[in-house]
């Protein structure tokens, strides 16, 4: 099980992992909000590996006694994603410009506060002296859902992870507006082995390896932990 913000990464590296481990025939992924996945694992859903987009959600699983090992392998920061079809394109320059007071009628989405991407957004809004109520017109259960709505033009903009915005912008699916370091926030990415299997350990070792981390940082815009 893995945070939805890792979907593009795992799709990209899956063949490389299998080539390096020919005895493993395949990997099955289940993506969603880290908080939702953590609750499922604690409640007994079967999984061999958990990749979380926050320390808090990983601790939920760890404190329930479900983890055999936990490693921090990357971190991410927030970014404003703008729909390429938005009439507000060019007028969205900072957090304040996401409000109706600056851009009347603008439609903005955030992840729900219980999801790591929503918690990250809350910290950014607080740092910018703003609030969720002043910005959000709708809430998404995961960053994947929020990104899709922005790309399709259902929303003008939203606060997502830098890695997701970079991936979309490189493909002409969105535009990115950087959030200043003084206002921005970070979230850590953690991997946990949940079952005592040699194959599971090989997969965890791969995520902690230099090749995977280099791909994360160079190709997808994640940061070193």
Placement of each model-derived feature along the sequence:
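Central helical "cap/lid" subdomain
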Residues: 65-71
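Short active-site segment of divalent metal-dependent hydrolases/proteases
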Residues: 51
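Exported/periplasmic ABC-transporter solute-binding proteins
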Residues: 1-22, 28-30, 35, 39-43, ...
């Amino acid at each position: 099980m893995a945070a939805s913000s890792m979907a593009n990464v795992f799709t990209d590296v899956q063949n490389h992992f299998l080539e390096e481990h020919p005895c493993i025939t395949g990997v099955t992924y289940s993506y969603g909000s880290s908080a939702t996945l953590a609750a499922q694992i604690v409640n007994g859903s079967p999984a061999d590996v958990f990749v979380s987009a926050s320390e808090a959600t990983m601790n939920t699983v760890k404190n329930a006694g479900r983890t055999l090992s936990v490693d921090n392998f990357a971190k991410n920061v927030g970014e404003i994603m703008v729909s390429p079809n938005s009439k507000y394109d060019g007028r969205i320059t900072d957090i304040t410009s996401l409000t109706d007071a600056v851009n009347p009628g603008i439609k903005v989405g955030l992840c729900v506060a219980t999801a790591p991407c929503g918690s990250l957004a809350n910290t950014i809004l607080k740092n910018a002296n703003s609030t969720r109520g002043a910005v959000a017109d709708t809430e998404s259960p995961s960053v994947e859902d929020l990104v899709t709505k922005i790309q399709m033009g259902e929303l003008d903009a939203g606060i997502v992870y830098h890695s997701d915005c970079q991936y979309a912008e490189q493909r002409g699916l969105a535009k990115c507006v950087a959030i200043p370091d003084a206002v921005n926030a970070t979230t850590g990415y953690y991997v946990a082995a949940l079952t005592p299997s040699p194959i599971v350990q090989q997969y965890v070792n791969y995520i902690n390896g230099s090749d995977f981390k280099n791909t994360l940082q160079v190709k997808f815009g994640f940061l070193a932990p």
